[in-house]
Amino acid sequence: MLSPRRTKFRKHHRGRMKGLAARGNQISFGDFALRALEPAWITSRQIESGRRAMTRYAKRGGKIWIRIFPDKPVTMRPAETRMGSGKGSPEYWVAVVKPGKILYEMKGVSETVARAAMRIASYKMPIKTQFITRIETKAPIVE
């Protein structure tokens, strides 16, 4: 699973996800992509399970790029702990995803294979997604 090697600070604020993705919203490497349509935190486990589903379906054919990286730590307090006494310890890592962000890209396979592989990966994601090709990159983000 993905996680940063080292960070400047151990714990982050939760923040909020306003607006559309300003960066990472164009296809850069492949010919086909999976685009997010909703804002969400996507965990490193979800990213990895989507990647595995795509590689298994494509039978090691083509190349896959993961365009998101989980760089935000999510902290949790131990169960049945009293209020106060500080913030919990980091439990897992998430990638902050806004609508329009490209999650995965694919190249070297036919469109039908890419579409089917990305459909399987989309079932692993906690959000609605959209399959796009390099030609449709400028298409509006419509659910």
From Swiss-Prot:
Gene Ontology molecular function terms on file: rRNA binding; structural constituent of ribosome
Signal peptide annotation: none
Sorted UniProt keywords: Chloroplast, Plastid, Ribonucleoprotein, Ribosomal protein
Gene Ontology biological process terms from the UniProt entry: mitochondrial translation
Predominant cellular place of this UniProt entry's protein: plastid
Gene Ontology CC terms: chloroplast; mitochondrial large ribosomal subunit
Subcellular location: Plastid, Chloroplast
Claim: Protein biosynthesis is one of the keywords in the record: no
InterPro entries: Ribosomal_uL16, Ribosomal_uL16_bact-type, Ribosomal_uL16_CS, Ribosomal_uL16_dom, Ribosomal_uL16_sf
Family from the record: Belongs to the universal ribosomal protein uL16 family.
Subunit-level organization: Part of the 50S ribosomal subunit.
Listed PANTHER family: 50S/60S RIBOSOMAL PROTEIN L16 (PTHR12220), LARGE RIBOSOMAL SUBUNIT PROTEIN UL16M (PTHR12220:SF13)
Protein name per Swiss-Prot or TrEMBL: Large ribosomal subunit protein uL16c
Species: Chlorokybus atmophyticus (Soil alga)
Lineage: Eukaryota, Viridiplantae, Streptophyta, Chlorokybophyceae, Chlorokybales
